[in-house]
């Protein structure tokens, strides 16, 4: 097949065609969901979502956007999409509108261009809405970029001070719960990114010890397949440009979880 450059595509199932969910023209490139068993999962159930308001920082990123999708399907009162990238914010807000239309949802989706390093902006947003839960997914996480001597200070400012800023805003505005998305690289860190996330974890643990009004927690993900900057998109790009496909060691073994699994 390699010699004749065959492309692999997926076509809709017979049940999807019969039920008019899809058409024969809906041919798509092969995705991770088609290969991995269990990659497609049901959205997480959120208690009392209809009366709750959520803020997701880094809402346009790989993890933040999936958290947004899963919460949105519970039809919450408000979702605030807090995102530094204009393009990513545009994409996730547009996707939310499509989901709301197809699922007949009534959530108030509020897109906010913001930076967790900007304390005044955080104060304004948190004081403007009665936020119940924060999912803090905003971070600089690309190890080689963060490791560069020109970027270390900005990475620390964003990942450490930014986390402190948004956590303080949550405390000052009586948020009920705050969940920080972290990484296994924060365990005995060997690089700058891991060190900044470890520092952030210490901040969250300390704030949780001294604040009874808000529940702080965090989750540490391992390798998330197909997230931005991970090896799968890199391999796809390398193959598309004719190679070579680069790995750190010929005997390396990695374990992955999918973005929906991690977010769920």
Regions found by a protein language model. Give the residues of each.
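Hydrophobic/aromatic anchor residues within beta-strands of the central parallel beta-sheet
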Residues: 111, 155, 178, 216-219
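Conserved glycine-rich Rossmann-like NAD(P)H-binding loop of the short-chain dehydrogenase/reductase
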Residues: 76-91
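NAD(P)-dependent short-chain dehydrogenase/reductase
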Residues: 97, 168-171, 192-264
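Conserved S-adenosyl-L-methionine
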Residues: 71-78, 174
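Conserved Rossmann-fold NAD(P)-dependent oxidoreductase catalytic core, especially the SDR/UDP-sugar
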Residues: 130, 136, 140-201, 206
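Flexible, Lys/Arg-rich cytosolic regulatory linkers and terminal tails that connect or flank
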Residues: 2-53, 171
């Amino acid at each position: 097949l390699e010699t004749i450059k065959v492309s692999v595509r997926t076509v809709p199932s017979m049940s999807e065609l019969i039920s008019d969910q899809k058409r024969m023209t809906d041919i798509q490139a092969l995705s991770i969901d088609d290969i991995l068993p269990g990659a497609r999962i049901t959205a997480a159930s959120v208690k009392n979502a209809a009366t709750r308001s959520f803020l997701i920082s880094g809402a346009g990123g790989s993890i933040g956007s999936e958290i947004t999708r899963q919460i949105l399907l519970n039809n919450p009162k408000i979702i605030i999409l807090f995102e530094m990238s204009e393009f990513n914010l545009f994409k996730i807000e547009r996707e939310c509108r499509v989901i709301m239309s197809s699922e007949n949802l009534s959530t108030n989706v509020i897109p906010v261009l913001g930076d967790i390093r900007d304390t005044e902006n955080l104060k304004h947003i948190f004081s403007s809405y009665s936020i119940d839960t924060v999912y803090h997914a905003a971070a600089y996480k690309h190890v080689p970029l963060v490791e560069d001597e020109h970027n270390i200070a900005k990475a620390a400012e964003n990942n450490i001070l930014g986390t402190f800023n948004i956590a303080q805003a949550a405390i000052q505005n009586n948020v009920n719960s705050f969940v920080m998305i972290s990484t296994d690289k924060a365990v005995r860190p060997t690089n700058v990114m891991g060190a900044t996330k470890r520092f952030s974890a210490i901040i969250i643990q300390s704030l949780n010890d001294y604040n009874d009004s808000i529940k702080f927690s965090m989750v540490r993900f391992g390798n998330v397949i197909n997230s931005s900057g991970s090896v799968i998109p890199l391999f796809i790009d390398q193959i598309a440009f004719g190679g070579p496909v680069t790995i750190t060691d010929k005997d390396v073994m990695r374990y992955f979880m999918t973005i929906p699994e991690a977010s769920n």
